[in-house]
């Protein structure tokens, strides 16, 4: 790991997929985010994306988050992981196309949870990638769990864990608007855009969000 603290870019599943469909990727948004990431030229970047209409429907169908209860769930565990690799592939396509040295890291191969919370993280690959100037790309995934058998690990939990473990200098949230508003700008034409927001100010506007 280089001396500079990493920056984590979190891209929500609802941003890069259409949650009203199933396996519906918003490729235009994915490409735009990749282009903006390339232009920003951030050093020591870690990317984490969610599942949206790829991971959620399958995981919900088989009750993966609640743990292993019967044999029929095993195909659901495998299928959920598979569709997440498909979405991850689309994200990887866009990043590499924009000359970003992105490298996919499957959380299912390096993370173990206990009752849904991260218990251990084998971070050798992640550290090596960062040290050598690559951009690790992780995602919400199906995970083996010490108590539940298996479960779902969200991108949000991954971001929180990585930010603490690597003392991230910044967390950037990739969204499909110009930033944080006091209302949904797609619905409210006069929604106010916050250029900067302190923790105290955020507490005051939470009720509007």
Place the predicted regions along the sequence by residue.
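Glycine-rich loop at the start of a catalytic domain that most often binds anionic cofactors/ligands
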Residues: 22, 52-68
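Short, active-site-adjacent cap segments at secondary-structure transitions
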Residues: 15-17, 52-56, 110-113, 143-145, ...
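N-terminal glycine-/serine-/threonine-rich phosphate-binding loop
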Residues: 1-46
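Polyanion-binding loop/helix "lid" in catalytic or ligand-binding cores
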Residues: 29-34, 75-92, 149-152, 157-159, ...
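Ligand-binding beta-strand-loop-alpha-helix segment within the catalytic cores
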Residues: 63-142
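Internal active-site segments that recognize and position negatively charged phosphoryl groups
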Residues: 89-91, 118-182
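Hydrophobic anchor at the start of a short beta-strand
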Residues: 7, 44-45, 102-103, 168-171
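Short beta-strand segments
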Residues: 8-12, 48-49, 105-106, 137-139, ...
